[in-house]
């Protein structure tokens, strides 16, 4: 068994959450450990549909949060729904800045669809229904270009 010592930020997992944590830790040194090549041992790459966020002038995080709480039939914490809805537009724009090829209209704005219990068109899609794969490819590319992140693929941890 190989023992390694590291005094930076350790991120375990190569899905969207792990990749996002590695990027957010900048400028601290990060070691990201994944049991498989990035994006292959996670469910993030399989996600379909799109990302819901209040991105249009006719929408707002408050409206998005209200729709989420109503659709949750009593199971959604209103405070957490409000936080996620408030952070959503920035998160989608950040993913787009990483290169996620969200569908756009002729003016370059996000092409949004209205789905499920959403009261407004707020689902930003990628190539119709390939959001997970395309978003992961963009975020993986950003991680690989980040000098502060060391990626260890095909590794397993047996203890901390």
Each PLM stretch: what is its role?
Residues 35-159:
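Conserved N-terminal/central alpha/beta ligand/cofactor-binding core
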Residues 1-6:
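A short, basic/flexible loop-to-alpha-helix module at the beginning of a structural domain
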Residues 8-32:
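N-terminal Rossmann-like FAD-binding beta1-loop-alpha1 element of flavoenzymes
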